[in-house]
Structure formats: structure tokens, C-alpha cells
Amino acid sequence: MPKRTSSRFLVLALGFFALYALTAQRGLGWGDSGEFHYRILRCADGLLGGCDSFATAHPLYAAIARSLCSTPYQVTLISSLFGAFAVAGFWLCSRNLALAVAFGLSHALWWLSCVAEVYTMSLTFVAFETLFLMRFLASRRLGWLVALAALNGVHVELHNFALLPLPVYLLAAAASLRGAGAGRIAVSFGLSAAAWAAGASFWLWALATRGLRDVLVGSYGGEAFGLLPSNWTVAGFNLALSGLSFVAPLALAWRAARAGASRPSSPRPSAAGPADSCLKALLAVHALFFVRYFIVSQFTFVLPTAFFAYLLVARVRLGRGRALALAAMQLLLPLVAWQLLASLPVPAWRPRHKYRDEARYFALPWKCGDDSADRCAAEVEGPWDGYPDCGGKARARACP
């Protein structure tokens, strides 16, 4: 990486890490975040942390957090750190600084960088896998394909999100190697398969010893395959929250459409190539998974979809005024959404007993000063007893 590029990468990563760390939740978290705090800090049952399935254990995340963290805030800072790396990785893919800043300020990424979750770490893998894919498509060098396969294999150890883009990667590699000769094709796919298997060795071991269902979906098969009945109130709430992350892509797509309608557009050098087709395919795969995954926290699964949406409009260059306007919109819209959701007569968005205001908690990405989970656990059952057991089989009795 050239010195100038690495300097900008580090400045962007450090800047957003500072933002996320300052606005992150200091104490215990709710729901899955509280479960991560409990498992990482209190459970010593191997990398699975006592989970009832490999699919929900996220062993790579657990291993990193356990080796570095001794307090709930430190566990949350893992999300902040990888959220910042994801922003910097997006910039490496797009080379559009203004849009990278807008992406870093988007609702879902900021929100998930302030709580204990695995999704920002997963997004960092997505960013660098995309970078390696684009480098391979541009150069046709085998090293980039092998690096992509190895990185995706390690990603599988973190989250099954990594399996979604595999068909796109395989088709892109096959199309790029078409006509290269049987020997080169065999070597390319053989080395890539070996690299992927090396990266995913623990996942493959779990697959062999625990079975396909345990590794892929665990007890969440109905949700993963979209077989459960939909709660349209919750779905509407999640779509509204997810929409807060697409301000910049929609604005830039509208601007590009207007510009294209008013004058003939000049051909973009890389737009017609395979990279553009791959980005669209990756967007479609992740968007399809997201829209039919009806769970209470559905909006937290929107990050890869938002990443590719931002990347596809990254070629639209922004002046300083428009960049500042987009940043202001990203900052103000959560406040507007909070007020709107709080004013609607929907029980799911009203304050949750005396501890948590649902509209505020989900609409505002920053979590500094939010000690609602600490107060709930301490008042009801003690600092840790209000959280799930190591197996994660039951939510908190009084603080679900």
C-alpha cells in the first residue's frame, strides 16, 4: 500500500474509532449484546462459550474479545474498532472520501459500532473481500483470488454471512479464467479451495462433528429460511430504521439519474466491466437475505446491503457543500426518526417498562450515557443474574 494511501486509511480509521468509542455504550448491553458481555466475560466453556449451536457462537469474535477484554466497555470497543476499519476499507474500495464519511455516519453502522455485536467485524471482512475481488478482476492475478478465498474462509469462522457471496465469487472467478487453459484453471481453483479450507478449518471441523443444521442455522432455522409468520408492525419498524442508512445512496442515485436525463452521459471506464456486475450481484444477494429475514432486530442485518449500495454510487463525486449536506442529513435524521417513532401510538415503539425507551434506543445510534441495562440488571436481580445463561437458551427473565 503506498504511503499516502496508508496514511489516509489510518487517519480515517482512527477518526471513526474515536467517534464510535466516545459514543459507545459504557456498561452492559441489552439482548444479544448483553449475552455477548456475559459469555465473553463470565463463561469459560471453550470458543463456543456454552452456546447450544456453532451458528450462534461466533467463535472468532469470542476468541478475539476474550483475549483482549475484561470489562463490558472493552468488549463493545471491539465493535467500534472494526466499524472504523470497515469505513476505511470502504474508502479503499471506492476512493471517495466524502461518501466514506457518509457511510461511517450512517445509522446502522454507527449503531452497531456502539454495542457489543459481531456485524462490524463481519463488515470489515466484506470490505476487504470486495477489495481483493476487485483487484483480482482488474489484474487476473492468482494471488488475489487465493487471498480472497483465505479471507472468506476466516470470515466463516465469524459469521455465516460469509457464505452468501460465495456463488458470486465462484462465477466471477470462472468468468475471469475462461479461456485460460485447463491447467491454470485447475491450479487456480485448487489453490483457492485449499486456502478457503485452511481459513475455515474450525468451521469445517464443526461441520463434521456437529452436523449441518447446527453449523448453519442452529435453532434459528425458521428465521434463516423465512418460514416464520411475519409481524408487519415489527417489519415496518425495521424498514424505517434501515432506511436511515440509505440517505446518501438514494440522494446520489437520484442526482445521477437527473444528470443522465439532462445530458448524454460519458462512459465510465470501470462501470461496464465485471467489477460493476459483481457489485450488483453482491448487493442483490445480501438485499434478498435481508428483506426476508423477519426478526425483531432485522435492521442490524442491513450493513452489507448498505455497503454495496454506497459502493455502487461511489463514482458520483461530491463537492464540499453537498458532502457537508449529506453528513448533516445523516446526523439529523436519527433525531427526527426518534421523535416520529415516539409520537406514534404503537406499543412496540413506546417505553419498555421503566428502563428502556424503545424509540430512543433503536433510532439514536449513539449509546453514551445509556445505562438502562445496568439499572435493570442491578435493580431486578443483580449485576449479572439478569442476563442469559452461558448457553444462551433463555433471555433474561426480567430484562429480555
Q: How would you name each of these model-derived features?
A:
Residues 100-101, 144-159:
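Membrane-interface alpha helices of multi-pass inner-membrane proteins
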Residues 57, 61, 65-69, 75-89, ...:
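Transmembrane alpha-helices of multi-pass, membrane-embedded glycan-processing enzymes
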Residues 31, 111-119:
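Short acidic/glycine- and proline-prone juxtamembrane loop motifs at membrane-interface regions
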Residues 164, 292-318:
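Hydrophobic/aromatic-rich transmembrane helices and adjacent perimembrane loops
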Residues 10, 97-101, 190, 194, ...:
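Signature aromatic-anchored transmembrane alpha helix within multi-pass, membrane-resident enzymes
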Residues 10, 77-97, 128-132, 311-312:
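Transmembrane-helix motifs of polytopic, lipid-linked glycan transferases
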Residues 119, 170-174, 185-261:
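Transmembrane-lumen/periplasm boundary regions of multi-pass, lipid-linked membrane glycan transferases
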Residues 23-38, 48-64, 73:
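Extracytoplasmic catalytic/substrate-binding loops of multi-pass membrane glycan-assembly enzymes
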